């Protein structure tokens, strides 16, 4: 088993976060959505301004590092979680906004460690659950099922420029 560290990311980590997204999205979404949509969504969600806005409006980002043979640490992925007040809800829940691990580190335990950190953050805040959106054809859907998330709904979101997100909404109750 790999030794993994999770640390809080800051504004100075935006380039790394963008880099992980740029390196994971082609293999994750390349057979699901067009390159034009990938480019649009990367600019929409991962520009310096977009990441700064997310960080400044309640989204917490975390970075996973794996210890290498030479005792050096290599950053391999990130996640983002934020409090969300759902329509009609009395309590605030949490949303897992993003969780990406570099292809070379998938299966290393980094994704599980990031998910565990996101769940810990939500539980410590007293949230009753955590939800997420995942593309219906993304293999991460199976990962989340194995971690106890249940499919709650499916939605097609118009994100502009003629593009849509065709997702499942999944939830983990604590």
Give the location of each predicted region.
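Acetyl-CoA-dependent GNAT
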Residues: 8-14, 18-104, 115-117, 121, ...
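Short alpha-helical segment within the catalytic ATP-binding CA
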Residues: 109, 113
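Extreme N-terminal starter segment of soluble prokaryotic enzymes
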Residues: 2-5
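Active-site acidic-Proline motif in GNAT/NAT acetyltransferases
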Residues: 102-104, 108, 136
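Short coil/turn segments at alpha/beta junctions that flank glycine-rich nucleotide-binding fingerprints
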Residues: 108, 125-128
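C-terminal "cap" of GNAT-fold acetyltransferases
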Residues: 92-94, 128-141, 145-147, 154-174
């Amino acid at each position: 088993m790999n030794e993994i560290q999770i640390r809080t990311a800051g504004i100075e980590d935006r380039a790394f976060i963008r880099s992980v997204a740029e390196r994971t999205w082609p293999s994750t979404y390349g057979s699901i959505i067009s390159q034009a949509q990938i480019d649009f969504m990367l600019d929409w969600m991962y520009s310096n301004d977009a990441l700064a806005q997310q960080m400044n409006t309640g989204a917490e980002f975390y970075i996973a590092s794996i210890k290498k043979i030479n005792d050096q640490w290599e950053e391999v992925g990130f996640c983002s979680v934020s409090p969300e007040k759902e329509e009609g809800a009395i309590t605030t829940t949490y949303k897992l906004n993003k969780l990406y691990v570099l292809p070379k580190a998938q299966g290393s335990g980094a994704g599980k460690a990031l998910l565990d950190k996101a769940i810990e953050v939500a539980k410590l805040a007293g949230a009753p659950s955590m939800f997420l959106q995942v593309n219906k054809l993304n293999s991460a859907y199976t990962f989340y099922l194995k971690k106890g998330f249940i499919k709650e709904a499916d939605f097609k979101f118009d994100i502009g420029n003629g593009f849509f997100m065709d997702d499942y909404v999944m939830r983990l109750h604590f």
